[in-house]
A protein has these predicted regions:
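Short amphipathic alpha-helix with an adjacent loop that forms part of the alpha/beta core around
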Residues: 1-3
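Conserved PLP cofactor-binding pocket of PLP-dependent enzymes
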Residues: 224-247
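Short, surface-exposed loop/helix-turn segments at secondary-structure junctions
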Residues: 48, 124-133, 173, 181-183, ...
Length: 327
């Protein structure tokens, strides 16, 4: 509620009531912009791992021969909701900068997921068609994309989504004639991505031996020179150790010493702005790091009052416990 163009912005994922709600805070700053992320539109609590199964995604995730739902590790709805909250905050601030005042904005996590399903066509798909979309393992839904195990035991993902990608795969693997024969046998054109999806098992049967007979280094350079869309399966540790895009060669990354934890690579914003130089990532504030500064500069407490708060155990300075993992 402080004055100025760079203040009066409040983003929270708590169902705030009383002194922290919009009605109360806006009495101190009428043009306050407040964005609240809730669980669902009814006010019930939700998290990514409850929204995801409720909307059917686990039933289309995992091995094709399994009926068990699979809750994937990526918190997709949290990530999308976070970006939507920022977009909403900036949109409301833009509204305010045009002289139209502040406002309260509410976004529900489940609504974010439901809207995304609609945007992806999944709601229309099950409404207009008779079959649910099932599991397809690592296959790219709707076109062609498949993982293959190579002679050195390494696994790669190869994509034939567009016509150019598809023709590139066939040429690089020397399977043009075999794919043409498959088209003639099935009486279809594999230039159509829907047919590549429909007959993906037949296509994979042709390509699988080619990869099984070769190590990744045998075709890596040729695939890259041909502009194919492919990658290798790696663990997070392997990616951090081997992929230059996760190293400081990539300008979004810099080495940061995080107090109480250690030194590791941290990304800044992935966007590059032409009108501003990139700012490297900085250590995250530690709990209690700015306690005295806030009490003094924001709350207006005297040094004596601050000392009394510390002595009473109401506030404290940073303390570093044993490092823990991300969970």
């Amino acid at each position: 509620t402080a004055p100025g163009d760079d203040a009066g912005l409040f983003l929270t994922n708590l169902r705030v009531r009383g002194w922290m709600d919009h009605e109360t805070l806006s009495q101190h700053r009428p043009d306050l912009v407040m964005v609240t992320l809730t669980g669902d539109r009814h006010g019930r609590p939700q998290v990514d791992y409850t929204v995801n199964p409720a909307l059917g995604i686990p039933h289309m995730t995992g091995p094709a021969d399994s009926d068990d739902p699979v809750a994937h590790a990526l918190p997709a709805w949290d990530l999308i909701a976070g970006n939507m909250c920022v977009s909403a905050l900036l949109a409301a601030e833009r509204h305010r900068l045009r002289g139209h005042g502040g406002q309260e904005v509410e976004i529900a996590l489940k609504d974010v997921a439901a809207a995304t399903l609609g945007h992806l066509g999944m709601i229309g798909d099950v409404t207009l068609n008779t079959e649910d979309r099932g599991k397809s393992g690592n296959a790219l839904y709707g076109a062609y994309g498949q993982d293959f195990v190579c002679a050195d035991g390494r696994r790669v993902m190869v994509i034939g989504l567009t016509d150019r990608q598809w023709r590139g795969i066939c040429k690089a693997t020397g399977t043009v004639e075999a794919m043409t024969a498959l088209e003639q046998r099935l009486d279809v054109s594999l230039a159509e991505e829907g047919n590549r999806w429909r007959f993906r098992d037949d296509i994979t049967a042709i390509l699988k031996p080619w990869f099984a007979q070769r190590r990744v280094p045998d075709f890596e350079a040729a695939f890259n020179d041909a502009g194919l869309t492919w990658s290798e399966f790696r663990s997070v540790r392997e990616a951090v150790e081997l992929d230059p895009d996760l190293s400081t060669e990539n300008p979004i990354f810099s080495e940061v010493m995080q107090p109480g934890i250690g030194r590791f690579r941290v990304p800044s914003h992935p966007a590059s702005f032409g009108a501003a130089e990139r700012v490297d990532a900085r250590p995250a504030p530690t709990l209690g790091q700015h306690t005295e500064e806030i009490l003094s500069n924001v709350a207006g407490c005297s040094s004596t009052e601050i000392a009394q708060l510390f002595d009473a155990g109401i506030v404290q300075s940073p303390s570093f416990a044993k490092p823990r993992n991300a969970a």
